From Swiss-Prot:
It catalyses: [(1->4)-alpha-D-glucosyl](n) + ADP-alpha-D-glucose = [(1->4)-alpha-D-glucosyl](n+1) + ADP + H(+). Pfam families: Glyco_transf_5 (PF08323), Glycos_transf_1 (PF00534). The gene is glgA. This is Glycogen synthase. It comes from Rhizobium johnstonii (strain DSM 114642 / LMG 32736 / 3841). GO terms for molecular function: alpha-1,4-glucan glucosyltransferase (ADP-glucose donor) activity; alpha-1,4-glucan glucosyltransferase (UDP-glucose donor) activity. HAMAP family: Glycogen_synth. Its EC number is 2.4.1.21. The keyword rRNA-binding does not apply. Belongs to the glycosyltransferase 1 family. Bacterial/plant glycogen synthase subfamily. It comes from the Bacteria. GO terms for biological process: glycogen biosynthetic process. The keyword tRNA processing does not apply. Pathway: Glycan biosynthesis; glycogen biosynthesis. GO terms for cellular component: cytosol.
Length: 480
């Protein structure tokens, strides 16, 4: 089976979040199930800088007003189609924001162009290759199925994955003419959304199947609390909605071989984590004692519950724990966490910014990772924690709920517990979870059981890829 995947970011070429990890890992995992994937992404400067030996596959003299070329290249096991359109993508800043951190005003056109190019490839305009199915990711690619509906494109099946419904690609109605869609596309059954143009909404209405990145999140987005205004649209498509948990690259995230980890280890050699623990203490200026080290590796935002972490830092220290934080985000939260470190030298350490090697070492050396997200479609850091024996303490929401088995009495007795869940997502809820963790930590046999059971969890892409392959096959066989 041939699949065209369409994404605004793909690891390892360009990444701002978990979307890139999925777009980079899923195509490789799908190969084992007979799925050949070509992934279309924009030609940002960071992408164009690293690709080599690219071949021109398709040219657009006028892609929504600008020239563009589709280049094909192989890169680290991925078959990539790069949309080289300098007018859209060759600019300073990131994929979505300018150097001042503001949305590019023409983001609607930049990602409509990506979607239109994808629909043309789906129609067979690229010589020698035509997909059997199109898989799009988030609002930036969601217009693909809209273009496929209204342009003379073969009725190929399409799948839209929602990685985070908070990001919807909503624009004023004045941009509609620039999309070059027929006038009758501006309806509630397509992209019209309360008088505006909704990219994600249009994809939800026109894709043949919709997936989210965990079963619990699939249920949550049907509610007003988590649906972000689109719960009614999703409810109308509930029979086509599937929750499939993400995996991680277990070759990259492997404590037995990870080049960043100072001392390698596995389930039978957990004592080797001690050297990594000492490295963490040295980096963050912590006292080198036996107190449990709780870590946070996250964007420092309200959605991630970082205000709660800042507010309970004093209590964690008072209970006898230590806390280390790696991340960046809202200035007020950065300041509050840095203030905690100043109040508690040797017990709290904070590093502002993102440091990929340190994120690996923290998973390999800290005792538990705290993930108090108010909503979390899937989450990856808890999967890394499971893999590395860094016990996850998570909010009971989204993919966190689906991937971490709470250490309640029944789960402990059955020896299946892998972490600690808490609800509600409040200071009280988090502190109760940390008290439970402190209690378990005092019983080294019980704590080791939690670590080992987590490390046994299958967090690879294999199961997820199998489910995607089955979904693809069912859609193709129906001739949609």
């Amino acid at each position: 089976m041939k699949v065209l995947s369409v994404s605004s970011e793909v690891f390892p070429l360009i990444k701002t979040g978990g979307l890139a990890d999925v777009s980079g890992a899923l195509p490789i995992a799908l190969k084992a199930f007979g799925v050949e994937t070509k992934t279309l992404l924009p030609g940002y400067p960071a992408v164009m800088k690293v690709i080599r030996d690219a071949v021109i596959r398709l040219e657009f003299p006028d892609l929504l007003g600008e020239r563009a070329t589709v280049l094909e290249v192989q890169h680290e096991g991925l078959d990539l189609l790069i949309l080289d359109a300098p007018a859209y993508y060759d600019r300073p800043g990131g994929p979505y924001l300018d150097p001042l951190g503001k949305d590019y005003p023409d983001n609607w056109r930049r990602f409509a162009a990506l979607s239109l190019a994808a629909s043309e490839i789906a129609a067979g305009l690229m010589p020698g290759w035509r997909p059997d199915l199109v898989h799009t990711h988030d609002w930036q690619a969601a217009l693909t199925s809209v273009y496929m509906r209204y342009y003379p494109t073969p009725e190929l099946p399409s799948v839209l994955t929602i990685h985070n419904i908070a990001f919807q690609g909503q624009f004023g109605s004045e941009i509609f003419a620039g999309l070059r869609l027929p006038a009758h596309a501006f309806t509630t059954e397509s992209i019209e959304y309360y008088g505006t143009v909704g990219f994600l909404k249009g994809g939800l209405k026109t894709a043949h199947a919709i997936t989210t990145v965990s079963p619990t999140y699939a249920d949550e987005i049907l509610t007003s609390e988590f649906g972000m205004g689109l719960e009614g649209v999703i409810a109308s498509r509930v029979d086509d909605l599937h929750g499939i948990v993400n995996g991680i690259d277990t070759d990259i995230w492997n404590p037995a071989t990870d080049p960043v980890v100072h001392t390698h280890y596995g389930q039978t050699t957990l004592k080797n984590r001690e050297e990594n623990r000492r490295s963490i203490a040295e980096f963050f200026g912590l006292d080198n004692d036996d107190a449990p080290i709780f870590c946070v590796i996250s964007r420092l935002t309200w959605q991630k519950g970082m205000d709660i972490v800042a507010n309970v830092a004093d209590e964690i220290v008072a209970m006898g724990g230590k806390l280390v934080v790696l991340g960046s985000g809202e200035a007020a939260l950065e300041g509050a966490l840095l203030a905690s470190a100043s109040r508690h030298p040797g017990r709290v350490g904070v590093s502002i910014g993102y440091n990929e090697p340190m994120s690996h070492l923290m998973q390999a050396g800290c005792d538990a990772i705290i993930i108090p997200s108010r909503f979390e479609p899937c989450g990856l850091t808890q999967l890394y924690g499971l893999r590395y024996g860094c016990v996850p303490i998570v909010a009971r929401t989204g993919g966190l709920n689906d991937t971490v088995i709470d250490a309640n009495h029944a789960a402990l007795a059955a020896k299946v517990a892998t972490g600690i869940q808490f609800a509600p997502v409040t200071e009280t809820g988090m502190l109760q979870a940390i008290r439970r963790a402190m209690h378990f930590y005092q019983d080294r046999k019980l704590w080791t059981q939690l670590q080992k059971q987590g490390m046994k969890s299958d967090v690879s892409w294999e199961k997820s890829a199998e489910r995607y392959a089955a979904l693809y096959s069912s859609l193709v066989s129906k001739g949609m």
